[in-house]
């Protein structure tokens, strides 16, 4: 576990979000650390805001930022439609894992992947 911290908007109780210092995650072999420049809370997160999850919770999975650390296998495991992701790249994260080549992806868009479990 790293000793570094970063700021995060944390849901601490129902309808209460606080900016807090949180422990930075470790970068896994096939992962990357992204320094966030912008993030949003999606409509799919609202059930956590309205219900009582196991607090504290960091909401949001739609984000953009700069890649500041990459595991040794990250470039192989991350699918990027514009080429290989490199250290220092600015990226927008699309949080679905899709094939991008099946009939549903090609006909209806990648949100309708027929191969992956979305």
Describe every region a protein language model picked out:
Residues 5, 17, 31-33:
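Intrinsic-disorder/low-complexity, polar/charged segments enriched in Ser/Thr/Lys/Arg/Asp/Glu/Gln
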Residues 25-39, 49-103:
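Glycine-rich beta-strand-centered segment in the early N-terminal region that forms part
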Residues 12, 23, 68, 117:
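Residue-level detector of conserved, well-ordered beta-strand and adjacent loop positions
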Residues 19-21:
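Well-ordered beta-strand positions in beta-sheet-rich domains
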Residues 44-48:
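Cytochrome P450 core scaffold surrounding the K-helix E-X-X-R motif
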Residues 9-17:
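Extracellular beta-rich ligand/substrate-recognition surface
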Residues 2-9:
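Short structural boundary motif marking the start of a folded domain
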Residues 95-118:
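Phosphate-binding beta-alpha-beta segment of Rossmann-like dinucleotide-binding domains, i.e.
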